[in-house]
Amino acid sequence: MSRPLSDQDKRKQISVRGLAGVENVSELKKNFNRHLHFTLVKDRNVATPRDYYFALAHTVRDHLVGRWIRTQQHYYEKDPKRIYYLSLEFYMGRTLQNTMVNLALENACDEATYQLGLDMEELEEIEEDAGLGNGGLGRLAACFLDSMATLGLAAYGYGIRYEFGIFNQKICGGWQMEEADDWLRYGNPWEKARPEFTLPVHFYGRVEHTSQGAKWVDTQVVLAMPYDTPVPGYRNNVVNTMRLWSAKAPNDFNLKDFNVGGYIQAVLDRNLAENISRVLYPNDNFFEGKELRLKQEYFVVAATLQDIIRRFKSSKFGSRDPVRTNFDAFPDKVAIQLNDTHPSLAIPELMRILVDLERLDWDKAWDVTVKTCAYTNHTVLPEALERWPVHLMETLLPRHLQIIYEINQRFLNRVAAAFPGDVDRLRRMSLVEEGAVKRINMAHLCIAGSHAVNGVARIHSEILKKTIFKDFYELEPHKFQNKTNGITPRRWLVLCNPGLAEVIAERIGEDYISDLDQLRKLLSYVDDEAFIRDVAKVKQENKLKFSAYLEREYKVHINPNSLFDVQVKRIHEYKRQLLNCLHIITLYNRIKREPNRFMVPRTIMIGGKAAPGYHMAKMIIKLITAIGDVVNHDPAVGDRLRVIFLENYRVSLAEKVIPAADLSEQISTAGTEASGTGNMKFMLNGALTIGTMDGANVEMAEEAGEENFFIFGMRVEDVERLDQRGYNAQEYYDRIPELRQIIEQLSSGFFSPKQPDLFKDIVNMLMHHDRFKVFADYEEYIKCQDKVSELYKNPREWTRMVIRNIATSGKFSSDRTIAQYAREIWGVEPSRQRLPAPDEKI
């Protein structure tokens, strides 16, 4: 029996997600039934909603495996250059819906589950996020995997299968509490363990110098077991692989010391080895020099390089070389991209393999290494740069330290030859930093050992060349490139905002989904009343849906007709959630001052996690919740102003809040946010941006036109000038009454009556040592926010500006980013050609 179709349901029949054929639906129902009984061993009397989710996941996965095997066979036959994306983080989120979107199965699965009396959306909500990342860097890696598959590149993501991903955030009494993220508790239907490809990784030991060369001996061995996850491209039958390594103790672990009777203890101690892949370090833009973290970094690199070389040697190309010891062709067959410095040990490890094991001479090995590796820089914050203590490396990786010293010696010889007599330049450029603690500067190692170095937005790449890597740019300018970040439009539009994807497809067709520049065609609809109405309607539906979600999950009631003002990202001083707080308090004080004056109602939502050891970030969360407690319970405010802290912000929550946002807050101090990618997601989903000229905001404003962007605040040059003059917060405090009032409220306990000095650390920081100059941008920010409210009063003009933003967001597809990496760094040509489906003849 079929349900009556609403207009919206009828429209789904012309969906961008592919039609549900009748055979398709009955086949899916049959497979669902089979998996429930034979894979999960449940019947409908005992099956839980989670069982139904797993049955659906296995049913969808069945459609992946044929394409996955086919793709790998295709790569073996054609032997293209392989791209290896090395990252300590892959922030994948959920997999079910993304797989259905990319395989055009969503409608059929929706219909099949409906016919079985189930709600697909409810089943999708059961899936755990794969939270193997902190924020932007890990999510970028995930978007890149999607684009590499969509562009038909023979690419592999390599990382660590953390047993515990980024912690779950609970807010208790306004404070962040962390809970372990046991995401594998119920199993993961998307991964396939590959124990047959387990590889040894060595630690500690010592170096023996023999007539044959150096030997690393007496090491401790940990095994790396790979788990493979399929990565489907968008409707091209390509399925690439993400391979994540899990640490396992070898069977003889601690037993070869055979201390009598120590058998039980030796088996219990296996945990120590297996701790390497236990947990993701929860630091974003902060370096913590812990031995376990260094072990993680070497673990992923050592296992991955063995795998890369095994695949190179057993390739069709490799097998034509009978002894397989010739690495001349290696850089033509292999590209290694280092996602930040975390996998930088790939450089000395590849050198160790080529020199110590494959017996290449140093110069040849170095040539191969440099031509193979490329490095992406993600931050200019000094506290985020990796600088490993020599004493740690000496103990853990003695041979690698020797190799780094040799690399450094030869590198500095080149510098000295290029800049004779410039001794200070040698000190600045050395890979080894002298000081109280001798350290290895991993960024310097990456630049020396790579043929390409890129920043992630135009302004960031310029800052690298002009400031932190200036010396290196002067030595080898040809190495430095820009690759502005992007986001995958599959997850960040089609999946999370089907209503908007549909409205767009009705005007310009569906091809934009894999060619986002086509959104420019929407510029001709900027005065089309029907389109304006449709875009506004979708936004309102998304806002209602998100309001219902907040009410259901968090029991908070919000006004869906208010302006949804959203700042979601990691909590960090440089991202300036505090500036947002100052605006909230300003609005509150204005309401209290003139309670009868009309004000555009706002719901201000802030979400994000603070690193567990980052005191100031945790205080910022407490401040946001404290402001909310005052504002949300003041009857004078009514529904004109609401402050919501979005607990446990993660990929799956981003997919809900971003489509509902009206205003996107991108307010970092100019020169601190390398790129940002949340900014792009909001732009694509029909929010307007208030932001500084920082990171990718600069290019977004350039694409949309500055008149369609709410730009405020100091530019990079202004910040530099202010630094030279000396930033003095007191000046702003004295000059701006509204600001002074806020600081007095924070100091006197207005927002913390039970503990009046609760926010003294925040006040002290803002007044005396604010590296990120919050007060310097306060006035312009408030004025700019007033302009936002003014425009919001005119819904038609607001929506026209939204359309201009959506139409010019095409540049920020990760497909464009990856096509540029492919052509300009990896030397491969992207392709949108489909592979034959598993049931098609090749």
Curated annotation (Swiss-Prot):
Q: What is its EC number?
A: 2.4.1.1
Under the heading PROSITE patterns, the entry gives: PHOSPHORYLASE
Question: Any one Gene Ontology biological process term?
Answer: glycogen catabolic process
> Which reaction(s) does the protein catalyse, per the Swiss-Prot or TrEMBL entry?
[(1->4)-alpha-D-glucosyl](n) + phosphate = [(1->4)-alpha-D-glucosyl](n-1) + alpha-D-glucose 1-phosphate
Q: Which residues in this protein are found as N-acetylserine?
A: S2
Activity control: Allosterically regulated through the non-covalent binding of metabolites, being activated by AMP and inhibited by ATP, ADP, and glucose-6-phosphate. The activity is also controlled by post-translational modifications including phosphorylation.
Q: Which residues form a coiled coil?
A: none
The UniProt record gives the binding positions of AMP as D43, Y76, R310, R311, F312, K313, S314, S315, K316, F317, G318, S319
InterPro entries in UniProt: Glycg_phsphrylas (IPR011833), Glyco_trans_35 (IPR000811), Pyridoxal_P_attach_site (IPR035090)
**What GO molecular function annotations does the UniProt record carry, in alphabetical order?**
glycogen phosphorylase activity; nucleotide binding; pyridoxal phosphate binding
Sorted alphabetically, the Gene Ontology cellular component annotations on this record are: Z disc
Against Gene3D superfamilies, the record matches this protein to: Glycogen Phosphorylase B
Which keywords label this protein? Acetylation, Allosteric enzyme, Carbohydrate metabolism, Glycogen metabolism, Glycosyltransferase, Nucleotide-binding, Phosphoprotein, Pyridoxal phosphate, Transferase
Which residues, renumbered to this chain, carry the PTM Phosphoserine? S15, S430, S514, S747, S748
- Identify residues that carry N6-(pyridoxal phosphate)lysine: K681
Q: Which cofactor does it need?
A: pyridoxal 5'-phosphate
| Xref: PANTHER family | GLYCOGEN PHOSPHORYLASE, GLYCOGEN PHOSPHORYLASE, MUSCLE FORM
Q: What's this protein's family per the entry?
A: Belongs to the glycogen phosphorylase family.
Q: What is this protein called?
A: Glycogen phosphorylase, muscle form
